Amino acid sequence: METSTETNVGYILNVDIEYASENSAKFECHDGFPLLPEKVVVEESDLSPFTRNLMRETGAKMTREPKLIASLRDKKSYTLHLAHLKFVLAHGLKLKRVNAVLEFQQRPIFKEYVERIVRLRRESRTASEKNCWKIVLNSLYGRMLLDSQNFVNCRVVRGERHCAKLVNSKLYRKHTVVSPNLVLVYSTPPSVTYATPILIGGTILCLSKLVQSYYFYERVQRCFAKPELVFSDTDSVCFMYTEEEAEYRKARESMGDVFDFSSFEPGDELYSDARKACPGFYKAELPYGSAVKDSKDRISLFYGSCAKMYCLQSVADSQIVKAKGVPFCLRRSLGPQTYHEAIFNNSITQGTYNKIVSYNHVLHTEVNRKRLLTLLDFKRYWLKCGLCSISLFRDDSEQIDKAHVCPYLAGEQSARELNKNKQT
């Protein structure tokens, strides 16, 4: 892999990669943040006994929809950029086969545009103006990932003969009766025109994975002995680690070039606005630098139940609650106490809300009851304590589960056993 990634020619490859499972101990440090996530269908047999028991008790059922999973198993027909491939090979993964190679001309055609948007966002005086420039930049990236194969033709039909002709067509999908004399007929387009630069969008997505992986494997793991991943998203990541004061300050100084310290207090020793609103740098999740050990505000409490469902609380009692799929009107009812009950008592939080829906272009008001918070997570192999997890599809997952001793609980009691003892 001596081909340079800085030339005018770029490469996207479809490869088969082996995670070198014969030396699983070497990749134990990868388990918290595995390389090369992929979309796969998770079967019930892939889940841990703890998750399966929780499914039976709550009556929950799995869906056959593919989920984005980060695991240590081998990858087949995986598509990635050459720079990303070089990175994973440098960290011990093995290249088994190259299935296809796409060569293209690469230039920084959006560099000036992005730099101008970043400058305008930095100069913004209001939050709405700042968010506006962010949306302008994100919308450009979203158009690059537009899938032309998902387009649908919709025709408004009033005649019976015309409607019958469209329904009998091979391209017919479905129809909606709006009134006795008006029907909407949906059909597949007869031809697909690929007019969006999907290669640019795919390259940006692949390089964003590379930025996250580089930060964890090249910076965090080299500065801290055992960093534990708390949560991660497309543009955010949070690790938990315990270090001595001297080691913490040394690591903080060595990693200062990847952070944006503009949200810290002006009197803080690390405060700087040189990287304010610049892409590619990490900033504090909480105001005034929660990542700084001696700052006035830092993260003091964290609860996480499943993907994109977590709660942060700081020393100054400020909270950040993330709850994907939960309506905003019900999100205010979630807090540290509800997350604590869901994790330690396996309780299910439900809520009722009203919404306006349209059926056949007629507005109705519905009263819905939704499950807001639960411990069910189908993206990780949850161990018997219910508080620790490992990646899915591991050959030694059952052995790890049997020998596991939870560091957050006394002895080998699970969270559910502790709750039963309290009730007794």
Each predicted region: which residue ranges?
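Conserved acidic
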Residues: 1-424
